[in-house]
Amino acid sequence: MADNYLEKRAEELRNQRPKVVRNHPSLETLLKRNRSYRGYDAARVVTEADLLKMLEVVPWVGSGMNAQPLRFKLVYGADAALVHPLVKLGAALPEEHLPHAGEEPSAYIVICSAASGRVVDIDLGIAAQSILLRAVEMGLGGIFILNFRPSELAAALQLPSQPLAVLGIGKPNENIFMVPAAPGDSLDYYRKDGAHFVPKLQVKDLLL
């Protein structure tokens, strides 16, 4: 009888243990936080380990015909200064001269491919979005950059294949807000009172 009592009591205690709830952000939260940041906190240095953690997602995502043509150059530490002058951020706000001095991305991921074509472009979008979502999950952020000087970038980093895009990575130090837009409205992003605003069409406006 004593043994049965002890077994029952042990079971009761096990059931009373507090359950550990892991508060991971939802996909909706990650997507909403994944903005194109053009200003970063220089105090948060992005390391090689951070970048490798972001790249962990790449083998998990889709690739056309499973060709997996993309290759990645990690640029961090002092080498990030090689990339700063070769990329441009905020083309719609030339008067802002973004990024401001001292607010450049802490690190970069340069995405390359020896192959080209529509499937590679689709792979590029899938991989870039996935990497940036992982960055947000890690408390960081980034920007998908297509406005850069590819030949000079390839030479500066001694890349063996053509750079297709650059991801700037860092700890964002700016506030970005999405605002509703209607068909016919300007969709240009803008800044007001130190905040950045991005007009977004609503689901009902996207339906055919």
Regions found by a protein language model. Name each.
Residues 1-208:
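Acidic, surface-exposed loops and disordered segments
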